[in-house]
């Protein structure tokens, strides 16, 4: 079966590599895919088990299944320009919350695609590990379990993909963990110790679940791969862009400098502000996200982390 992957960043390339084990894959991107990405340590998707052909949008639209790995902040504009069929079978691999409209990914997507044709990828994984064929377990959330299983069956032998519902829980967990991961990077960068880090992540998980429950997310989603699994991975590894943002902030570098040095999108930065605004609107208690938002706006990193630990 032919699968089109939209997005030529690290995540898009890794997913193209993964789906290429069992399927014919086309990748659609403005980037030159012959140019190695630092995020992937120079690995090219052409080294995968099957050749990945880069094609234009119109050719990509002829595929049977679509995988979308576009930055959340550009996702709405991308949908507007791509003009996918309303009944297209879509797996969205983007994680975050749209700042402009404070919208969840599913809210953006349903404006363009039949909700019964939408799936959302969640769970702990790094592009740099997937492109090496290292094993992981992921979750495909969808109201259409048959479609979720169809996508799951297309994943490679080194990925165990589970089909679940609870779209809102899965996407909030995937977005919120990036916020906590920044705080985790700050904690490690300041060398506050394992006890402080454990407290931060434990309370961060509770905060994620509280926020998600307000919108109907299920507790078991936050305790599983989509929530705790993704959080513990992202908040503890140098492979995480959001974690590296925290490390940079811990060195008292201005956010602009940290992001410039990163050279990649760290969704957690903008997601933090979106979460705080949503929480303020609905009266949801989000102490870690709220304190992190102040840090991102220039508050002293030591003062911010001390306040965060005391409040968390």
Curated annotation (Swiss-Prot):
InterPro entries, alphabetized: 6-PGluconate_DH-like_C_sf, 6PGD_dom2, G3P_DH_NAD-dep, G3P_DH_NAD-dep_C, G3P_DH_NAD-dep_N, NAD(P)-bd_dom_sf
Pathway(s): Membrane lipid metabolism; glycerophospholipid metabolism
This protein's GO CC annotations: cytosol
GO molecular function: glycerol-3-phosphate dehydrogenase [NAD(P)+] activity; NAD binding
Residues reported to bind sn-glycerol 3-phosphate: 95, 123, 125, 177, 230, 240-242
Protein's UniProt keywords contain Ribosomal protein: no
Gene3D superfamilies reported for this sequence: N-(1-d-carboxylethyl)-l-norvaline Dehydrogenase, domain 2, NAD(P)-binding Rossmann-like Domain
Annotated catalysed reactions: sn-glycerol 3-phosphate + NAD(+) = dihydroxyacetone phosphate + NADH + H(+); sn-glycerol 3-phosphate + NADP(+) = dihydroxyacetone phosphate + NADPH + H(+)
The family this protein is said to belong to: Belongs to the NAD-dependent glycerol-3-phosphate dehydrogenase family.
Protein name from the UniProt record: Glycerol-3-phosphate dehydrogenase [NAD(P)+]
Gene assigned in the entry: gpsA
């Amino acid at each position: 079966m032919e699968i089109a992957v939209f997005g030529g960043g690290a995540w898009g390339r890794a997913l193209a590599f993964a789906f290429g084990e069992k399927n014919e894959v086309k990748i659609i991107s403005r980037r030159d895919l012959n140019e190695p990405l630092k995020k992937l340590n120079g690995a090219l998707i052409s080294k995968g088990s099957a050749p990945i052909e880069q094609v234009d949008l119109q050719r990509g639209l002829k595929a049977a299944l679509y995988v979308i790995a576009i930055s959340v902040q550009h996702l709405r504009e991308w949908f507007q320009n791509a003009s996918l069929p309303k009944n297209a079978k879509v797996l969205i691999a983007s994680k975050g919350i749209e700042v402009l409209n404070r919208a969840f990914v599913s809210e953006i997507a349903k404006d363009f695609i039949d909700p019964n044709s939408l799936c959302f990828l969640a769970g702990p994984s790094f592009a740099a590990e997937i492109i090496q064929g290292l094993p992981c377990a992921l979750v495909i959330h969808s109201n259409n379990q048959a479609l979720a299983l169809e996508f799951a069956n297309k994943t490679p032998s080194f990925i165990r993909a589970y089909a679940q519902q609870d779209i809102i829980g899965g996407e909030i967990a995937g977005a919120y963990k990036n916020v906590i991961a920044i705080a985790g990077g700050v904690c490690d960068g300041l060398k506050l110790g394992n006890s402080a880090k454990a407290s931060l992540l434990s309370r961060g998980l509770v905060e994620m679940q509280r926020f998600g429950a307000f919108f109907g997310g299920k507790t078991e989603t936050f305790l599983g791969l989509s929530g705790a699994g993704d959080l513990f991975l992202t908040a503890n590894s140098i492979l995480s862009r959001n974690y590296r943002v925290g490390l940079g902030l811990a060195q008292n570098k201005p956010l602009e400098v940290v992001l410039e040095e990163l050279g990649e999108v760290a969704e957690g930065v903008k997601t933090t502000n979106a979460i705080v605004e949503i929480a303020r609107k609905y009266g949801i208690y989000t102490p870690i996200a709220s304190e992190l938002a102040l840090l991102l706006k220039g508050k002293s990193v030591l003062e911010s982390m001390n306040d965060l630990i005391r409040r968390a």
